[in-house]
């Protein structure tokens, strides 16, 4: 595509991208059709936050560096052979090389910077020059499935909050949060599924309206008084999207001596330039200032974050169960002088880490056919293969009833080391015998047990102090490449922003072949096993027990593990 001089090559309002459905291939095999469809699915207007700008979610998390790069990626995937591998560097296709049929068809590296230069200032300079792209986690790795992708993890967190703080009873209680973007938009539905009501503050009215249309939020309010009244008057859990600035609303609740039961936040605070609206600013003024004076925007945003975090700390002191939901807002506040910003915990060490110790995390799959029936059939297969987990069955039932598909039908389902390979093999067999209309792709969030180093989120407070060691996601990516995942990605800065995380992703295509079965056996065992390994190495007993039960070979721990079998 040609761009007129001065036009942003990342913006094209004339295009609407949707993944092909059905069994007619544009590429030469399903192994290359799969990444093609999932790339396009990431930019489906029913999936992406700002598809015309290639932005999928998370501030400026993109699927491709610019539209010329997108077009070239599509062109290459359509011609790629099953013994070739495409290399993608920060959203730009840079090479096609000979490999072999069991190698990944695509290898992706996004947003990676040498540590000394791993900050937003340097990234933004490279981004403006067209030399880099922010891939977030599943945006640049082509496995975003809309807000459903984080619903179950958020649901599991809220269930854990209820168990820990309210004896398992969420009825009559409410959650305060901020942000209704691609990730934050999952919060209202997850909260009501877990039995809580919620007020979610969002400064962009179009995002509230979108969550209303897709069933993720129940009501809209334009004043705090209206939102509080909706929650108070409802006999059942209800979610409210409140139009406003999170810092303003959180501070107003403190001033009015109104204390929610639970307080958290999922604004895009990880990116102070693009992801957080300063107090007193309109959306239009912020957009204008981003073009004129980036440093002023960043400073104003971080000052507002400090106000919000101070309010969260005060609400915590008044009895609210307060948690950071992984957007690095505590770090931003700390940099603005809020010395006790980390006095409330992150959600992973507080509620999720025991799951990670067993390799349990956000396993997800999508139906390349585009037919919802393929997902419903896989839902049933999960129940058949895991019959003794009523909590999981309840999740699948709620998901079918309450979650609208965005783009290609997909499902998120938190399972671990002992189940992922079994499910993958079953799905592959369903493709082989014609139960499913087309292949399934299986992937996950980079927020998983063995695929991320993020000291302010997934690896916060590791018991051996290894929070910042990022060898683990690198090893995870290398092992998934060696095992034959269909595409593998290695990113920096997802979730918490530049300089604060490194993480890897994988996707594998179940095309019904024996070769796929062999790859599934390797990848869907090894991938969660690296999470068990990482946590066992850090000293977690749950992980050691799991490693022993699953027969992992961990040389420095084998003697200890042998006593646990």
UniProtKB/Swiss-Prot annotation:
Record keywords: Cytoplasm, Histidine metabolism, Lyase, NAD
Pfam families in the cross-refs: Urocanase, Urocanase_C, Urocanase_N
GO biological process: L-histidine catabolic process to glutamate and formamide; L-histidine catabolic process to glutamate and formate
Cofactor(s) required, per the database record: NAD(+)
Note on how the cofactor is bound: Binds 1 NAD(+) per subunit.
Active site as annotated: 413
GO molecular function, one term: urocanate hydratase activity
Subcellular location: Cytoplasm
Domain of life: Bacteria
Enzyme Commission number, as recorded: 4.2.1.49
Membrane-spanning parts: none
Pathway(s) annotated for this protein in UniProt: Amino-acid degradation; L-histidine degradation into L-glutamate; N-formimidoyl-L-glutamate from L-histidine: step 2/3
SUPFAM superfamilies according to UniProt: Urocanase
InterPro entries, per database record: Urocanase, Urocanase-like, Urocanase_C, Urocanase_central_sf, Urocanase_CS, Urocanase_N, Urocanase_Rossmann-like, Urocanase_sf
Reactions the enzyme catalyzes: 4-imidazolone-5-propanoate = trans-urocanate + H2O
PROSITE patterns: UROCANASE
Binding site for NAD(+): 58-59, 136, 182-184, 202, 207, 245-246, 266-270, 276-277, 325, 495
UniProt family annotation: Belongs to the urocanase family.
Protein name as it appears in the record: Urocanate hydratase
Gene transcribed to yield this protein: hutU
């Amino acid at each position: 595509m040609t761009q007129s001089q001065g036009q942003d090559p990342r913006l094209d309002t004339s295009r609407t991208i949707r993944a092909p459905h059905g069994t007619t291939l544009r590429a030469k095999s399903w192994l290359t059709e799969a990444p093609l469809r999932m790339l396009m699915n990431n930019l489906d207007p029913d999936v992406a936050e700002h598809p015309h700008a290639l932005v999928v979610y998370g501030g400026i998390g993109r699927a491709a560096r610019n539209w010329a790069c997108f077009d070239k990626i599509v062109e290459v995937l359509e011609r790629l052979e099953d013994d070739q591998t495409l290399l993608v560097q920060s959203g730009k296709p840079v090479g096609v090389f000979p490999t072999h049929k069991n190698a990944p068809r695509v290898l992706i590296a996004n947003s990676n910077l040498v540590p000394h230069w791993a900050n937003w200032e340097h990234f933004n300079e490279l981004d403006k020059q067209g030399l880099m792209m922010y891939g977030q986690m599943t945006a640049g790795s082509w496995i975003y499935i809309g807000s459903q992708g984080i619903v179950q993890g958020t649901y599991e967190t809220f269930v854990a909050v209820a168990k820990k703080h309210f004896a398992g009873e969420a009825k009559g209680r409410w959650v305060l949060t901020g942000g209704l973007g691609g990730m934050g938009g999952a919060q209202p539905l997850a909260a009501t599924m877990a039995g809580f009501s919620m007020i979610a503050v969002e400064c962009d009215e179009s995002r509230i309206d979108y969550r209303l249309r897709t069933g993720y939020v129940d009501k809209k309010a334009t004043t705090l008084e209206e939102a509080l009244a909706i929650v108070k008057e409802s006999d059942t859990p209800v979610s409210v999207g409140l139009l406003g600035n999170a810092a303003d609303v959180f501070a107003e609740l403190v001033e009015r001596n109104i204390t929610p039961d639970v307080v958290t936040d999922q604004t895009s605070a990880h990116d102070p330039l693009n992801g957080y609206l300063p107090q007193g600013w309109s959306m239009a003024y912020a957009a204008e200032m981003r073009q004129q004076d980036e440093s002023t925007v960043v400073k104003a945003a971080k000052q507002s974050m400090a106000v919000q975090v101070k309010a969260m700390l005060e609400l915590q002191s008044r009895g609210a169960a307060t948690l950071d939901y992984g957007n690095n807002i505590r770090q931003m506040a700390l940099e603005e002088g809020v010395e006790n910003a980390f006095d409330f915990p992150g959600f992973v060490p507080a509620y999720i880490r025991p799951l990670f110790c067993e390799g349990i995390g956000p396993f997800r799959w999508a139906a390349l056919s585009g037919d919802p029936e393929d997902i419903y059939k896989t839902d049933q297969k999960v129940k058949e293969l895991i019959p003794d987990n009523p909590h999981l069955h309840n999740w699948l039932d709620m998901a079918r009833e309450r979650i609208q598909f965005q783009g290609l039908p997909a499902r998120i389902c938190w399972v671990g080391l002992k189940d992922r390979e079994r499910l993958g093999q079953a799905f592959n067999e369903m493709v082989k015998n014609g139960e499913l209309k087309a292949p399934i792709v299986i992937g996950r969030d980079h927020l998983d047990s063995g695929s991320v180093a993020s000291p302010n989120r997934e690896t916060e407070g590791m018991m051996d102090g290894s929070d910042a060691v990022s060898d683990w996601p690198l090893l995870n990516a290398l092992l998934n490449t060696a095992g034959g995942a269909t595409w593998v990605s290695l990113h920096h800065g997802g979730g918490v922003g530049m300089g604060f995380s490194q993480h890897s992703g994988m996707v594998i295509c179940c095309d019904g072949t024996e070769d796929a079965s062999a790859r599934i056996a390797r990848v869907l065992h090894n991938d969660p096993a690296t999470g068990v390994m990482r946590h066992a190495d850090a000293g977690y007993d749950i992980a050691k027990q799991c490693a022993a039960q699953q027969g992992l070979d961990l040389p420095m721990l084998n003697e200890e593990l042998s006593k646990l079998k």
